[in-house]
Every structure is written in C-alpha cells, then in structure tokens.
Curated annotation (Swiss-Prot):
The gene is atpH. This is ATP synthase subunit delta. F-type ATPases have 2 components, F(1) - the catalytic core - and F(0) - the membrane proton channel. F(1) has five subunits: alpha(3), beta(3), gamma(1), delta(1), epsilon(1). F(0) has three main subunits: a(1), b(2) and c(10-14). The alpha and beta chains form an alternating ring which encloses part of the gamma chain. F(1) is attached to F(0) by a central stalk formed by the gamma and epsilon chains, while a peripheral stalk is formed by the delta and b chains. F(1)F(0) ATP synthase produces ATP from ADP in the presence of a proton or sodium gradient. F-type ATPases consist of two structural domains, F(1) containing the extramembraneous catalytic core and F(0) containing the membrane proton channel, linked together by a central stalk and a peripheral stalk. During catalysis, ATP synthesis in the catalytic domain of F(1) is coupled via a rotary mechanism of the central stalk subunits to proton translocation. This protein is part of the stalk that links CF(0) to CF(1). It either transmits conformational changes from CF(0) to CF(1) or is implicated in proton conduction. Pfam families: OSCP. The keyword Secreted does not apply. It comes from the Bacteria. It is found in: Cell membrane. GO terms for cellular component: plasma membrane; proton-transporting ATP synthase complex. Its main location: membrane. Belongs to the ATPase delta chain family.
Length: 179
C-alpha cells in the first residue's frame, strides 16, 4: 500500500467512525460523492486549494464559501485536512470512505468487460450470480466494452478476476495444443 493511500485511509477511517457515532454514514457518503464530483469537474478550484502560497485561513475561507451547504461536521473535517496540509487527499479519502460504506452495506464494485454493451437484464443476472459468489448483497457494475475479448465476459471484483471470454478460451486451447 502506498504511503498516500495509507494516510488517506487513516483519515477516511476516522471520518467513518465519526459518521457512525453520529448516525451520518449515508449523509457523509452522499456529500463526499458530490464533493468528489465537484473537485473532478473544477480543477482550478483544486489548484487554488492546494496552492502553497495561500494561507491556511485563506484556504478555509475558500472551502467555506464553496462547501457552505455540506454537513458542519464534514466541513470541520475538511478544515482539519487544510490545517494539516492534507487537502490534496480529499478525493482519495472520499474513495476509501465509500469503500467502507460499501463494505458495511454488503456492496462491492465490479467491472464487467464485454464485446458489446450488456442489457439491464444481463447486468442484473451477473450482479445476482456474482454477489452470491462474493457473499455480498449487491454489486455496482460498470460495463466496459473490450472488442479484444472476441466474445463472452470478464468480471473483475476487487482482486478477483472471472474470465469467461473467448480470447482466454482460445489462449488456453493454444497452450494445450503446444503442450
């Protein structure tokens, strides 16, 4: 694990603990998702927030103006990050926090690769089958198009890969023939 991810993980875990204590886990999850989307959409704001020539107070005033509608506890957390010069971790913290929420709710993220876009019915069926395999209640599936698979699907959930693509089957046959 990289040092940055480790640091972000500590902050995310602390925020998650506070959210659980205050029964705000879902509120923080929604607000962090919106906050991350806003940061990704506005790179100039991120540059200002991470600018070392700005004082801590100037950064807090900027954050206060932009994040005025978020939960006060979450806003205080952002101020804490600014105080400790960790504002550049905010996006990663949001990701780690969401992973903790997903773990709590029995949800996992899955990337499904296919040659053509899968229908809602196919995605639902894949979600049901692989959620059961992973002991999860639900999978958030992201469908990616990969023409090199030739056919079939490849499902990636965390570090696990389930590859039922024609490309892999052909490679397996090639290895068997050469052996």
């Amino acid at each position: 694990m990289s040092k940055d991810l480790e640091v972000a993980g500590r902050y995310a875990n602390a925020l998650f603990q506070v959210a659980q204590d205050k029964d705000l886990v879902d509120v923080f999850s929604e607000e962090l998702t919106e906050l991350k989307a806003a940061l990704n959409a506005n790179k100039d704001f991120v540059k200002l927030l991470e600018n070392p020539t700005f004082t801590t107070e100037q950064k807090k005033n900027l954050a206060s103006a932009v994040f005025e509608k978020i939960n006060p506890t979450l806003r205080d957390f952002i101020y804490l990050l600014i105080d400790r010069s960790r504002e550049d971790y905010l996006s990663v913290i949001a990701d780690v926090y969401q992973k903790r929420v997903n773990d709590l709710n029995g949800v996992a993220d899955a990337d499904v690769y296919s040659v053509v876009p899968l229908s809602e019915q196919e995605l639902t069926a894949l979600s049901r089958v692989f959620a059961a395999k992973m002991n999860k209640t639900k999978l958030n599936i992201q469908n990616h198009i990969d023409k090199s698979l030739l056919g079939g699907v490849k499902v990636v959930i965390g570090t696990r890969i389930y590859d039922d693509s024609l490309k892999t089957k052909l490679k397996d046959m090639e290895r068997q023939i050469k052996a």
